Amino acid sequence: MAGEHEDVAAVRRWFERLAEHVHAVDFVGARAIFAEDMIAFGTFADFMTGRDKAEAAQWRNVWPHIDAFRWRPDIRAIVSADRLTAVGMAIFDSTGYTPDGTPYPRPGRATVAFTRRKPGDPWLANHTHMSLFRDVPTRSHKGKPEKVT
């Protein structure tokens, strides 16, 4: 059971790392927590194959335009018996902006599938599905600079 708790804690840490990258608008740093051949659904592209496409179509259309991205504490995860795959689900909150700069709440949800070569290795996301709750505007209009490394 100790391995299961460690694995779920590692899934939670992955979500926190993603939040750090979103806050910093750190696309380069975020690449390391996603599989190169990932598949994804998102707000700005119905179906994406590849981390580079997810970054171009999704991350760059969201991260620089929102503030205060955070996960709610109740992150859920299930881990396979061999401890090599997992699925995590979480609810997020962030602040979006109308074209005139008025802030609005921007809640949503995420399901992330993870993989790794051996137990104890960091999780890599090989599938993400992030979506806003109903009636939340999809486009936020703030602009922040990308982190330069």
Sequence positions of predicted segments:
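Short, low-complexity N-terminal intrinsically disordered segments enriched in polar/charged residues
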Residues: M1-E36, G143-T149
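Short solvent-exposed loop/turn micro-motifs enriched in small/polar/acidic residues
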Residues: R13, R70-R72, P107
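A solvent-exposed, acidic/Ser-Thr-rich amphipathic alpha-helical stretch
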Residues: F27-L84, A90
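Hydrophobic/aromatic beta-strand elements that line small-molecule binding cavities or substrate pockets
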Residues: Q58-W59, P73-V79, F92-S94, R109-R116, ...
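Short, cysteine-centered beta-strand-loop-beta hairpins and adjacent loop/turn segments enriched
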Residues: H65-I66, S94-P105, R134
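Glycine-rich beta-strand-turn "strand-cap" elements at beta-sheet edges
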Residues: D74-A81, M130-R134, K142-V148
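Short beta-strand edge/turn micro-motifs at domain boundaries
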Residues: P107-K142
